[in-house]
Amino acid sequence: MISYAALASSTESRVSTLGWRYYRPMALPDYHYLYDHACERKGGEKALKALLPKTKSKAQLKKLGSDRYLAEFTRKIFQSGFVWRVVDKKWPQFEEVFWEFDVERLLMMPDDMLERKAQDPAIIRNFSKVTTVRDNALMIDETERREQRSFGEFMASWPAEDVVGLWLYLRKHGSRLGGNTGPFALRTLGVDTFLFTQDVEGFLRSHGIVDGGRTSQRALKAAQAYFNDLREQSGKSLAELSRIISFCHGQNRVQ
């Protein structure tokens, strides 16, 4: 089988700068096969449609304040490696302790105040994660200054066919937003993105689309190329396609 991973390094001349659109080997599952298989595993088309995620429009993403982006980045950072429901239960206290994630106010927070907040029993006391609040507030502020537009406008303008580029941006410029943390935050915010869940990664590997480290640029480009291809076939969002694939492989979980 010809793998997308191999194509990602051997067919650069076929790539459009934005979308990494490689030739699609015919042996790979097409959208109709995936959709029918997911319907079968979830108990029918109606049941499947009810489980597909929704994304926000570009207009909605533009209107979303920088405080909401920072809040969701922070929530996902604290949920990483922890019990999600505990973070969710304490979230109103997080909002209070961090001034509803007011970026400008957080940027003025001195180190000693940051240390005190990290010891506040109202939230989860993890100093290294608490420091990301100010670090990511700085990332948002610097992005807005460089781009001369709001962070919401910046996020909304990023093309879905290069969403892994946005993952890489958050990984490079943000704090603790690498791995699945950044992508999961984007999904929750309503940005159209696929996810490297265990089932999705297993599917991509089993079909030779991805090999090696999943966070390598080669793997990300190969995965993006396959999802772009499915998107062109179906007209579905990356988020919907990711969920459909997750139902076609492994433990058939909603992720």
Region roles according to the model:
Residues S3, S9-S16:
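Low-acidity, Ser/Thr- and Arg-rich intrinsically disordered low-complexity segments
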Residues G19-N126, V130, I244-Q255:
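N-terminal polyanion-binding entry modules of DNA glycosylases/AP lyases
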Residues G19-K54, Q148, G152-Q255:
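C-terminal accessory module of base-excision DNA glycosylases/AP lyases that mediates lesion recognition
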Residues W99-R176:
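Alpha-helical ds-nucleic-acid-binding substructure associated with the helix-hairpin-helix region
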Residues A8-S9, Y22:
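Short linear/disordered segments characteristic of secreted peptide precursors
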Residues D67-A71, P92, F127-R134, V164, ...:
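Non-catalytic, well-ordered alpha-helical scaffold segments
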